[in-house]
A protein has these predicted regions:
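Conserved small/polar residues in nucleotide/adenosyl-binding loops
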Residues: 392-394
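Gly/Pro-rich turn-and-neighbor structural signature
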Residues: 83-181, 186, 266-326, 330
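Conserved beta-strand -> loop -> alpha-helix junction used to position metal-binding or nucleic-acid-contacting
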Residues: 195, 203-241
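Basic, short loop/linker segments at the boundary and entry of helix-turn-helix/winged-helix-like folds
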Residues: 2-78, 90-99, 106
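Short amphipathic alpha-helical "interface-anchor" segments enriched in bulky aromatics
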Residues: 196, 200, 211, 215-219, ...
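Short helix/loop capping segments that flank catalytic or ligand/cofactor-binding pockets
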Residues: 10-11, 41, 48-51, 139-141, ...
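Helix-rich, typically C-terminal accessory recognition domains appended to large enzymatic cores
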Residues: 295-338, 346, 350-351, 357-384, ...
């Protein structure tokens, strides 16, 4: 038994908190008023309703800006297809069909987001540096018409551009004409790409190659020639003495590695474009010129159809474009910037697999453009989508 005199009441309270995740329905209440009531208590005038000033995001729909933003975030960022979102919402007591979700997202992209998307496309064409890439996408409506492979094209602004954005555009194929349609036929800036011929058709623009692509092709050949089996530098040197082809590939990779190490140091030292230009002229130009001389002298050591032969030929064919970055401190040595921006689409494609319709693919291109641009600017993606949908639909 505890005596009451032994109990001391502590005046300071211990507070604890928990975060609770919950769904809710925001209801609007409309007040009704009568203008006049007679002596018998009857309404003489008709009922007057207070105006409901809230404008629906989609007429006749319960969808709000945050709901559509959440659906888009789950699909395009988290990689959750609509059928799985439908299952999860049903489990939580919110039965919404995937058809409704799809309709909401497409309506919002067409009615509210597309004008913003078109402005972004216009703005990115004013950038001095752009990066381009393309990747396949399956569109069932196109497949039924046998149009061949369908493509999602990507255009993103250069590292030093004031406006940081990524623009996705769907097109039924990879035809050269669409590159001009997307970028603008009169574009006169710098186009970073992977060697695709479509980007060489611009009379006023300067194409820049991708050293990372060249390195990858050489490394694939290097791996075939026992590269993956060699454990240390000593083994490598011994193997190279007795395998001339391997030694050639190893030398090429070493030279390219040096170039990338220089670029990494410039980033680490936070150099300005002007300083980068000077450093490249002093540290890289002679080495890169020497590398192309080496490629030319040793290309006959490989058959044209071998991986090594194709890799070396790629480098020689791309020589001018691969060297162009030396002439501009804002240019990049590779097109990795575009590849990083297109990767979220590639990863998402593994989850949702295909688009049913052309309009669905075009809608996806709009959402991906806004989402990846938000990422590039350090924004909260879901909050950003909610904000612009709330703002634009008013």
């Amino acid at each position: 038994m505890v005596s009451g005199s032994c109990i001391n009441v502590l005046k300071k309270e211990d507070l604890s908190g928990r975060k609770v995740l919950t769904d809710y329905v925001l209801k609007s209440v409309t007040d009704n008023y009568s203008e006049e009531i007679n002596e018998d208590g009857e309404i003489k005038a008709k009922i007057v309703s207070a105006p409901n000033t809230e404008k629906r995001l989609i007429k006749g729909s319960l969808a709000s800006a945050s709901v559509v933003a959440g659906l888009a975030f789950n699909k395009f960022v988290s990689g959750t297809p609509l059928y799985r979102q439908e299952q999860e919402l049903k489990r939580r007591g919110v039965p919404i069909s995937r058809a409704s979700m799809s309709n909401w997202m497409m309506r919002c992209s067409d009615d509210y987001l597309k004008p913003l998307y078109e402005l972004m496309k216009k703005d990115i064409r004013s950038c001095e540096h752009i990066h381009m890439d393309e990747t396949t996408v399956t569109v069932l409506e196109e497949k039924a018409e046998r149009t061949g492979k369908n493509y999602m094209w990507l255009m993103c602004s250069g590292k030093w551009e004031e406006q940081q954005m990524a623009i996705y555009c769907y097109h039924k194929n990879r035809e050269h004409a669409f590159a001009k349609e997307m970028i603008g036929e009169d574009y006169s800036g710098k186009i970073h790409c992977d060697g695709y011929e479509a980007y060489e058709k611009f009379e006023k623009a300067t194409p820049l190659g991708c050293m990372a692509h060249f390195r990858r092709y050489v490394y694939e050949a290097y791996e075939l020639d026992a590269g993956s089996k060699i454990k240390n530098r000593t083994e490598l040197q011994e193997y190279a003495k007795t395998h001339e082809a391997f030694g050639i590939l190893n030398h090429i990779l070493s030279e390219v590695k040096y170039l990338f190490e220089c670029e990494s140091k410039y980033i680490k030292d936070k150099l300005t474009p002007e300083e980068i230009y000077t450093k490249r002229q002093d540290e890289q130009k002679e080495r890169l010129e020497g590398l192309f001389v080496y490629l030319d002298e040793h290309q006959t050591h490989f058959t044209k159809q071998s991986k090594a032969g194709k890799a070396i030929q790629y480098g020689l064919n791309q020589k001018e474009k691969l060297m162009n970055y030396l002439n501009d401190g804002e240019a990049e040595i590779s097109n990795n910037r575009a590849e990083r921006s297109v990767k979220p689409f590639v990863m998402g494609r593994k989850a949702w697999l295909f688009s049913n319709t052309i309009s669905g693919a075009e809608s996806s291109s709009i959402y991906y453009s806004l989402i990846e641009s938000a990422k590039m600017n350090g924004l909260d993606i879901e909050a950003y989508l909610t904000y612009i949908l709330s703002l634009i639909h008013i």
